[in-house]
Amino acid sequence: METLPYNDFGNWIRKKFPFRVQKISVDAGFTCPNRDGRLSVNGCTFCDNRTFSPSYCSRIKSIKEQIEEGKAFFARKYPEMKYLAYFQSFTNTYGSLEDLKRKYEEALAVDDVVGIVIGTRPDCVDEQKLDYIAKLNEECFVIVEYGIESANNETLRRINRGHTFECSKEAIKKTKERGIITGGHIIIGLPGEDQNESLRQAPIISESGLDILKIHQMQIIKGTKLAKEYTENPF
């Protein structure tokens, strides 16, 4: 088998558990500050949550129902599987602390769930929320994943993120200080960014302190603002 030049997530996660684990996506009913009017109402120009949400993942169902349906789907292949509840849709720390506690702990109470993965924005965590997540981290497996998207503030403005890269660095620092496994997402090929710009950002992202990095290719989804921009002015 060819040895990869990096530590891929599959090999890494297998070393964390004595059993096979699978993430189950959950839509816990959150929104985003650039959707609900606090920062904007338009959302990120590239985003359509429906494109990465499994069929069992629906906010009209309870968190427990979504996880149980996800378990039924994956158990057909691996009956002895354990699970990580993946709070994936929208911004999963954008709510009151009590709301977060209720939702996270509902997921953790489901049989065979051994941890949670929290997808969020770097401008939607504070000391109180991070302290609570750090406490959870003492009791179960926790990953916090930040949507960084780019280290270029002009790009972040152009795609209507509503935060800066400096905000991402600060959130990563505070999360890491609490001993929480910290991940980040970036997108290659955002408007205005070519190969040289991606290579310029690589050491900047690398030095941010992340434990996990997910690299996505740019996808232009029909119906998004970015699709309209691309139709009018291809990049």
Predicted features along the sequence, with ranges:
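Active-site mouth loops of central-metabolism enzymes
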Residues: 35, 89-97, 189-196
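Conserved C-terminal portion of the radical SAM core fold
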Residues: 166-225
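Core AdoMet radical
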Residues: 50-70, 74, 78-97, 112-125, ...
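N-terminal [4Fe-4S]-dependent radical SAM core
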Residues: 1-84
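Short amphipathic alpha-helices and their capping/turn segments at secondary-structure boundaries
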Residues: 70-74, 125-139, 170, 199-209
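Acidic (Asp/Glu)-rich catalytic clusters
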Residues: 74-78, 103-111, 131-141, 173-177
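Short acidic, glycine/proline-enriched helix-loop-strand junctions
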Residues: 225-235
